Amino acid sequence: IDYKRGPASAYIDALAGQIGGIGGPISTIFIGGGTPTALGMPLLKKLLRGTRRLAGKGIEFTVEANPESLDAGKLDLFLDEGVNRLSIGVQSFRDAKLKKLGRIHSAKKAMDAVILSKKKGFDDLNIDLIFGAPAETLDDCCAEFAQAVKLPVTHISCYCLECEAIPTDEEDSARMYSLAMEYLPARGFRHYEVSNFAKKGFECAHN
């Protein structure tokens, strides 16, 4: 798919039109449920410009991003357009697992994306992690959480893999979820919602 023109451009035009018809009040803005950063800069700018007018003072404004399509230029654009929270789809810090999940970024790219976002000025950073992949052990999962808390993140979302094409062990997944509920709070991330853990004051208002 060409995310710079054609159907993508028509979609953003239609979406911008719908956004333009929204009144208020708006309590949160969340652009995601896909990969907004896959869009070319002109379309991304159009989407953000159309949305920014809804972002009143103090409103949580989140954009989802994938490591492979997040760069300095897009981070600057986000800041210019009032985005104050990023949710980065890290998924894993192990290259073999990322490949098995069909992700095209590397573990290093994921960590670099988080660090760059922090350097650019994003103080409210979430990362998504997936547990329960085939052949994943409890030790593997613990190592993922250990790496996550070393990064400058304020929020961690942990999701169990759900894919009919990739069988998972429900008991193993349950143990990994229990591990998350023990490990992350012990390191300052409060378990405030089913899949979400946050440092004090950084709970996602949109959840």
Language-model segments: residues:
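Accessory C-terminal segments flanking Radical SAM cores
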Residues: 195-207
